Amino acid sequence: MKVSSQESNWQKTLPKPFLGFQKNRRLEEVECIIPDLAGMSRGRSMPIYKFTPDTTFSLPISLFYQTISGEYVDMDITNQWMEKDIVLRPDMETAAAVPWADDATLQVINDLELSDGNPLNIAPRNILKNVIDLYKKENLKPVIAPEIEFYLTQPNTDPNEEILPPIGRNGRKGVRQQAYSMVAVDEMGSVIDTIYEYAEAQGLKIDTVIQEGGAGQIEIN
C-alpha cells in the first residue's frame, strides 16, 4: 500500500523519541485513547490509513459512568442511558510509541468535546486544564513530581492461589524489609531494563528507581 504525501508529511513531524524507536518500520496502527474517571485507558484503534491529525470520531458518554471494576454507577443522571456521543479530537503533542505492541503502533491521547464543539466538562483532561487556568490567573505555575509505586509478582492466572513475590536473578523470591536496597533492584534487572527501554521509546524521563519496604515493591520517580 502506498502512503500519500499528506500522510507521510505528518508522520515526519512526530516526536523524536517516536521516530527514534520507529526507525525504518512502516507505521501500521494508531491507538486513540482517553483516560476515564478511574484513570483507565479507553478508546479505539485503527489502521494508519484511516488516521490523520484532523481525524475525529465518537464514543458513548456512558463510558464515564463505569467504575474501576466495570460496573455502572448507581446515580440519578439525567438521560443517563441515551448513549449520547462525545467527540474525540487527537492531541498530537501527546503522540508516542507503543513499544509493547507487536506491530509498529502510534498512541495519541485525545481531548473530549460535545457535538457543539464545547469541551466535555467531566473529562479528566478538561478538568485539569481548568485547574491550570486557575493557577495562571494567579500568575502561578504548578509543578508536579510524578511517582509510580507498584508490586512485581510471579505470574498468577488462578485467583484462588496466593500472589507471590517474583523470583530474582539469584533464583530466590524477593523478601521484605529491603528498603533502598541496590541488590534488590538489581535482582529485578531484566524488568527494570524493559521499563527504561519503554519509557525512552515514549519520551518519558525516569529520575530514579527505588526498592521499597515490601517484597517486590518498586517505586519509580
Describe each model-derived feature in a short phrase.
Residues 1-208:
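ATP/Mg2+-dependent ligation/transfer catalytic cores
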Residues 148, 212-220:
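Short, conserved phosphate-binding/catalytic loop or strand-edge motifs used
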Residues 176-177, 219-221:
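Short beta-strands and strand-loop turn motifs
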